[in-house]
């Protein structure tokens, strides 16, 4: 993948008449491809509209990027989990070669990222948003190991915070309880809601670096859970009824009817019984 990235960048330099192209990477977190119009076009109806035809979200800006550029329809993550997939993205290596094959394992010091290569070629490099490659730190603002991202003031290691603010000591989570950061919305508005806040900071950086070649990565922590958002978006789709996917109904029906020993009849010969139904990773991935 690393070679592919740089072949792509080199090809862009020819497209732009030998000039160094600017690079902007916008990354979202657990974003179901069915929520993007540009991907629904490539799916069968039963896959594209698993929640119903009347409940889809329109994504005109993302769709226009796909139409005017290119869209990957055969692109797979070596590990569809946060830390390892991010490690692969910035390094071009398989997760097991980065030191980060599972969540919360820090990237090896020896890893060379695309940002480091571009920085050495004169690019202004910056990173905003969720990083998740610096171990357990949470939120972990501006890690000391920058991996080529010269400006990482607005990089935080992990967490899905909903409210940010600036202080004299730098950025911090705005929603707090007992002076500790929480995932609550708090008083988040169009200036402090996490996505809005990060986008505003990215625009400031783009304005600062506009007269030089730049590479900026904006890693938005949404739409990963908790599934909370500021108004007007919080109530925007309250009137819609989402259909449960057919495959989910089938699986739940099978679970409902099995196993027989869970019933009172099936367990009558047990003097004492403890029934535990445990679910792993039950959140809807969007």
Where are these regions (language model features)?
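Sec-dependent N-terminal signal peptides
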Residues: 2-13
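Short, well-ordered alpha-helical scaffold segments within catalytic/effector domains
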Residues: 3-5, 111, 195-203
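Boundary at the C-terminal end of the N-terminal hydrophobic targeting segment
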Residues: 15-17
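Active-site-proximal cap/lid insertion segments
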Residues: 21, 30-56, 158-197, 203-286
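Active-site segment of extracytoplasmic enzymes that catalyze sulfate/phosphate-ester chemistry
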Residues: 21, 25-28, 32-127, 136
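Glycine-rich, histidine-containing beta strand-loop boundary motifs that form or position
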Residues: 76, 128-129, 156, 218-220
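Catalytic-site neighborhoods of secreted/periplasmic enzymes
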Residues: 85-191, 231
